[in-house]
């Protein structure tokens, strides 16, 4: 993947403003609410019976932070995302058996959450750069499945 200097700047500039625990929790909760079939991968998280329960669930919030922290690793390694996510791809494929389509779903929810939190800063150019990034990350996470 080739990143332009502008894309790299847009990604890193916005990322410097991101509240990882909040945005991560909101993105994961959003996916679990909007795509309820994804909840089957989180059966040990306790109460996921409603949007309110999901959004207030401490395990969802903690895992959302963990997920977005890993996403931050992609930003630190934009030129080597595939290798950055090799072990996570293996874990999600071989042990957790996560449908790789879910990586795309979470990426799309993340875009919506970023737009909601960072409105003016989330310009069309920034949106395009982040859309490219979530697609590259989803592809890297799905790599083990191919």
UniProtKB/Swiss-Prot annotation:
SUPFAM superfamilies: Globin-like. Residues 2-146 form the Globin domain. InterPro entries: Globin (IPR000971), Globin-like_sf (IPR009050), Globin/Proto (IPR012292), Hemoglobin_b (IPR002337), Hemoglobin_oxygen_transport (IPR050056). GO terms for cellular component: blood microparticle; haptoglobin-hemoglobin complex; hemoglobin complex. GO terms for molecular function: haptoglobin binding; heme binding; metal ion binding; organic acid binding; oxygen binding; oxygen carrier activity; peroxidase activity. GO terms for biological process: hydrogen peroxide catabolic process. Pfam families: Globin. It comes from the Eukaryota. Red blood cells. Heme b binds at residues 63, 92. Keywords: Heme, Iron, Metal-binding, Oxygen transport, Transport. Involved in oxygen transport from the lung to the various peripheral tissues. Belongs to the globin family. Heterotetramer of two alpha chains and two beta chains. This is Hemoglobin subunit beta-2. It comes from Iguana iguana (Common iguana). The gene is HBB2.
